[in-house]
């Protein structure tokens, strides 16, 4: 089923590739696929490294890691309650499922027995929202940070932001800065604040995520007696500054789309656009009228508050704040649609898809990876997202409306994505 932006969701709410780790771990493809050689098993190996958190190294190193841990996987397969190695993984339940698959494959491999894999293997986007925003404006530096460009090892924008935060803290002459440096500023502190940028993340949300990360990182051993509010507030200012310095084009796109949404709202119109697949996306954010009703329940009078949409009204604040995340979601939905269509044309019919993580059988992963890159490149070569929004606004809004033109594009060659091993990996 689809939402209004074209994003796709399984009808089943629990057993779904889009659910939590323990839910994904229970899923396998009904149709098995033979693993005939080491090439067919390559993405099964890489998937194992990924779910264990060994995903900041090259694909070759991930594959080597999996073969170095065959004995561990076999031990887990034989007795997962005693051998708890799988519990050390970033995604422990998917790691357990992988251990079972990897152990059976390697046991059979020794004797030349055929092995049919049923395990979905996934290739994950690198901060996918920022990948789309960087592609829209052809931002070369932003694109490099989120792996739109080829590189020998994966780039990590969360680490880039963390390094910039450290530089900013070193410039401060305050005890709080020294305390934070002593605790250590790492990618875990900056990951979630960076991830929410394409979705209109706020400074308040940034502070909350930093607070949670600090609590997890150093609860019971910190200079603040476990009072993490002040250090989180202090650090969030530098994280927010670093994000704005590292992620420039993304903010340009977001600010532009927000301004167009405000123009629509001022004229009492809902902001709308067509995605590259041709789907019309319309934001429907009405102003709300607050009402109160009284009713009887078990002999008592109960008063309930509720909100009712006001017809023919537009909530300008929600329209503006929702514009950027809804646009990005509509674009990742379009990219997924094009990818699936291309894969089906190649004979692939089994998918485990999230909007920033595409999965299928290990032997089919090379084809899936090729087609998802082709789909992304073709989508942005053939569709100028902001120009289309501008043209639509000029047509839809009142004559004489001063519609701002889109920001200028950078020098990124979008076809470089075709050769980027870590665009999705």
For every predicted segment, state its role:
Residues 1-425:
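Conserved catalytic core of nucleotide polymerization and phosphodiester-bond processing enzymes
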